[in-house]
Amino acid sequence: METFLFTSESVNEGHPDKLCDQVSDAVLDACLAQDPESKVACETCTKTNLVMVFGEITTKANIDYEKIVRDTCREIGFVSPDVGLDADNCRVLVNIEQQSPDIAQGVHGHLTKRPEEIGAGDQGHMFGYATDETPELMPLSHVLATKLGARLTEVRKNGTCSWLRPDGKTQVTVEYHNDNGAMVPLRVHTVLISTQHDETVTNDEIARDLKEHVIKPVIPEKYLDENTIFHLNPSGRFVIGGPHGDAGLTGRKIIIDTYGGWGAHGGGAFSGKDPTKVDRSGAYIVRQAAKSIVANGLARRCIVQVSYAIGVPEPLSVFVDTYGTGKIPDKEILNIVKENFDFRPGMISINLDLLRGGNGRFLKTAAYGHFGRDDPDFTWEVVKPLKWDKPEA
């Protein structure tokens, strides 16, 4: 049997790029909670002792940007300079302007257009992907890398591994078999974890704790064997981390946010963007479409693409590819997708309830992936029942 190796990586919430994603989405949540019609394009950058929030926001909401920044950093665990950032004493810079009136008139007519008339906030193309290799209908390499990162944060915050600090990265290589287009994971080939730590812990303690408290609870035993390779803090030392170690910027972890390198990506980031930005809402609706195709038994694996022009409600194109795993021809599946999903941005916002803020709704998406999550706020993960004529056995 021919096999191949595929690798996906993740970073946890203390990575400086992810800190920025979370601040940007915390701002979005605050805007939508007070004003669901808010138009938000919020970027964040960070370096030692500094967080800057900038972009274009038009909203009726009264937003305390500095408080949002400090609260978000504090919740992550950046509470002193020695861990990479001090939430209460770092500098916070804010440079927010209103949305360009040229964009506003073209996209939503300065809030005069009905939902079905709202145009895309920009041009672009987005991809949704699904595969039957996991219960989440997500790639196993991505799922495991993401869950390892989430587990790192969990054992740091609950005190199981008190030597952990907020920053960290994970990577998982899985050995796969290609079953006529469907992906069948056979085993985990390599596990890589690089995590920030305090100065007192030894490398042996790090390796022991990571295997016992992070890897074993996350990776099913059936995927591990005597040949699985473990690289646990292979650089030997990772005390300096967070914004002290590296600069951070919103939108630099788009593969981690999506499918871990599987499928495809149109290049647009998610965090800090309201639903008129099809980089986000378009990617959410095509994930629901791809997931629904697989969940309804139309295919074992599927990718869906949609594309837009700025100011135009209707998509320019919709594309479906089932990698040869479709139960019926892809052309018929494409017709089913077009009949069951409304790709107009205003209707995506309504059908996926994307204008609802509060509950840290979009902040939750900004770490550990936007897809494959079991959370009622992730409305795009709800499978739509699709009607199709199943061929007789």
From Swiss-Prot:
How is this protein induced? Repressed in roots by ABA and mannitol.
Family annotation (SUPFAM superfamilies): S-adenosylmethionine synthetase
Q: Which GO molecular function annotation, any one, does this entry have? A: ATP binding
Positions that bind Mg(2+): 9
Which ranges does the record mark as transmembrane? none
What keywords does the record list, in alphabetical order? ATP-binding, Cobalt, Cytoplasm, Magnesium, Metal-binding, Nucleotide-binding, One-carbon metabolism, Potassium, Transferase
Q: Which organism is it from?
A: Solanum lycopersicum (Tomato)
Query: Which residues bind L-methionine per the record?
Result: 56, 99, 246, 277
Quaternary assembly: Homotetramer.
* Reaction catalysis annotation: L-methionine + ATP + H2O = S-adenosyl-L-methionine + phosphate + diphosphate
The function of this protein is: Catalyzes the formation of S-adenosylmethionine from methionine and ATP. The reaction comprises two steps that are both catalyzed by the same enzyme: formation of S-adenosylmethionine (AdoMet) and triphosphate, and subsequent hydrolysis of the triphosphate.
Tell me the residue numbers annotated for binding K(+). Answer: 43
What pathway is this protein said to act in by its record? Amino-acid biosynthesis; S-adenosyl-L-methionine biosynthesis; S-adenosyl-L-methionine from L-methionine: step 1/1
Q: In which tissues is it expressed?
A: Mostly expressed in roots. Also present in stems and leaves.
Q: What is this protein called?
A: S-adenosylmethionine synthase 2
Which GO terms fall under biological process for this protein? one-carbon metabolic process; S-adenosylmethionine biosynthetic process
Q: Its family?
A: Belongs to the AdoMet synthase family.
Q: Cofactor(s) for this protein?
A: Mn(2+); Mg(2+); Co(2+); K(+)
Cofactor binding note = Binds 2 divalent ions per subunit. The metal ions interact primarily with the substrate. Can utilize magnesium, manganese or cobalt (in vitro).
**Known Gene3D superfamilies for this protein?**
3.30.300.10
Pfam families hit by this protein: S-AdoMet_synt_C (PF02773), S-AdoMet_synt_M (PF02772), S-AdoMet_synt_N (PF00438)
Q: Name one GO cellular component term.
A: cytosol
Q: Which gene encodes it?
A: SAM2
PANTHER family noted in UniProt = S-ADENOSYLMETHIONINE SYNTHETASE
